[in-house]
Amino acid sequence: MSSIFKSSIGKKLIMSISGLFLILFITLHMCLNLTYVFDPTNTVFAGVCEFMSLGIIKVIVPVLAAGFVIHIIYALILTIGNRKARGEVRYAVSNKAAVDSWSARNMFVLGLIVLLGIALHLTDFWANMQLKEFMGQTPDDVYGLMSGTFASPVVTLLYVLWFAAIWFHLTHGFWSALQTVGWNNQIWLKRWKVICGAYVTLILAGFAFIAIYACAKANGLV
């Protein structure tokens, strides 16, 4: 059994499963954050933030972190292996057309940009909320953080560019991961591309909308 995960296909499978897990997380994250926009009284968003401080969430955080670490490690392993193999693709796709897109050719670079964005996001929010609470300190007010962070159009633009990088990364990564886990019916190939592309676009457009709305709100435009 262990030999399976030492093989190229096994490594791709691990990276794909961890990637799908992270897609599920960002979907939930975006849906919860939308309450900031569509809750004029801020009661729902405050409830969401309170929920995020529960003990069960503190247990989930290490699992989520492990998902990121596993995905990054196997991305590095596969990228190095692919370069040594002179062009072997990162995912278990079954035809050359699957890796002809710009996103497919730049998955590793896009991944690095996404990683830098995660570091920025953790510094802006997680370090000032969950980490402070974990350290026994008083966490910052989430509304103050939203206003303080997105009041700067430059910071807002950086976040939007980060979301764009995630979009490019996932437009290829999502359906490629589905192929790797076995959903590789050629009849469905084009359909999966459309479905996954639409899904990723909806999620990342939601994130961008939240950031732009927060910027407009912080500057008194809404």
Mark where each language-model region is.
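Membrane-embedded alpha-helical bundles that constitute the cytochrome b-like, heme-associated redox core
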Residues: 1-222
